[in-house]
């Protein structure tokens, strides 16, 4: 009888401990903007950028992923690269 009581108490404690697991967190965000203008009879992209962020704890550690892209028809390649670097640092 004592073994049965100990087994019941142990089972209740195990069930109680395993039911208090932390919830899985997953958050995703996406943003996109574009501006175009007709210049010299041609439609030009002034800016086109997109940003994606995601946060999750699938591995037990909180992981943040950030991706950004930028493009423009009126800026020089060096200026475009500079803006891309600034977006990826955010």
Swiss-Prot record:
Tissue expression per record: Main cells of the accessory glands of males.
Principal localisation: secreted
Keyword flag Signal: yes
GO cellular component: extracellular region
UniProt-listed GO biological process terms: mating behavior; sexual reproduction
Subcellular location: Secreted, Extracellular space
Keywords: Behavior, Secreted, Signal
Residues in the signal sequence: 1-21
KW Nuclease (keyword) present: no
Function field: This protein is transferred from male to female during mating and may affect egglaying and behavior after mating.
Protein name, UniProt field: Accessory gland-specific peptide 26Ab
């Amino acid at each position: 009888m004592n073994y049965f009581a100990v087994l019941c108490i142990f089972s209740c404690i195990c069930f109680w401990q395993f039911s208090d697991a932390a919830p899985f967190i997953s958050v995703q965000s996406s943003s996109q903007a574009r501006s175009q203008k007709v210049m010299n009879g041609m439609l030009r992209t002034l800016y086109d950028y997109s940003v994606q962020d995601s946060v999750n704890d699938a591995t037990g550690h909180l992981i943040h992923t950030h991706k950004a892209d930028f493009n423009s028809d009126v800026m020089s390649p060096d200026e475009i690269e500079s803006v891309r670097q600034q977006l990826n640092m955010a």
